């Protein structure tokens, strides 16, 4: 039973590290940082950065709160036109539904993982969790960044209705969240998740050495 619990804890750790990293990325600070970068693409139809940034933050609020979604639906461009089409609103509602399951599941599994580690009192779980996390991320990273647009499309087709998330370049969602935004966001999540794994790995190694030294 102890080995089975250890195996389960090791297997769920990458889900936890990726989920927590994604939650950190889903923040206004990340959006502000991304928009402040010199190589962030300008809007080809001339929308000012301030307006794009405001709408991008509103999109974030929309997928994490009911109030934000209501504001998102009512949003207007500076010219008075409706900012988002019904199709764009529908997709963001789909994203909100997905995140309402995904993030809570990450929190629950995080608690289970921490409780399991304390229950087993084994630094080996930390070590193997870190190793498995690093190897899996390396594998997924190679697959993802070899052809990012294809990986992006595959992910969306699996998680959402394949016909619900594709938009025209002139649609506001594409203008405020260009592919560069998602590429950088994915890279940020991957790196942060990798660092989480390394931290857990070295915590396990140092803890094991400490116990050995104490026993000696």
Swiss-Prot record:
Transmembrane region(s): 5-27, 98-120, 125-147, 185-207
Topology of this chain in the membrane: Multi-pass membrane protein
Subcellular location: Cell membrane
Protein name as catalogued: Uncharacterized protein aq_2036
Keywords: Cell membrane, Membrane, Transmembrane, Transmembrane helix
Organism encoding this protein: Aquifex aeolicus (strain VF5)
Keyword Transmembrane in annotation: yes
A Pfam family that the UniProt record links to this protein: Lit
Gene Ontology cellular component terms for the protein in this record: plasma membrane
């Amino acid at each position: 039973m102890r080995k089975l619990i250890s195996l389960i804890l090791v297997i769920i750790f990458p889900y936890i590290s990726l989920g927590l990293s994604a939650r950190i990325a889903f923040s206004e600070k990340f959006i502000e940082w991304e928009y402040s970068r010199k190589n962030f693409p300008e809007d080809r139809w001339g929308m000012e950065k301030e307006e794009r940034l405001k709408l991008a933050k509103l999109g974030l609020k929309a997928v994490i709160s009911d109030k934000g979604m209501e504001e998102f639906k009512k949003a207007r461009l500076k010219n008075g036109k409706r900012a988002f089409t019904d199709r764009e609103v529908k997709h963001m509602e789909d994203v909100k539904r997905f995140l309402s399951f995904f993030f809570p599941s990450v929190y629950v599994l995080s608690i289970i993982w921490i409780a399991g580690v304390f229950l087993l009192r084994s630094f080996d779980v930390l070590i193997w969790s870190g190793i498995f996390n690093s190897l899996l991320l390396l594998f997924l990273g190679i697959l993802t960044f070899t052809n990012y647009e294809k990986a992006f499309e595959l992910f969306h087709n699996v998680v959402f209705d394949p016909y619900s998330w594709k938009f025209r370049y002139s649609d506001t969602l594409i203008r405020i969240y260009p592919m560069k935004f998602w590429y950088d966001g994915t890279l940020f999540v991957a790196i942060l998740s990798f660092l989480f794994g390394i931290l857990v790995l070295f915590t396990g190694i140092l803890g094991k050495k400490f116990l050995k030294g104490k026993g000696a």
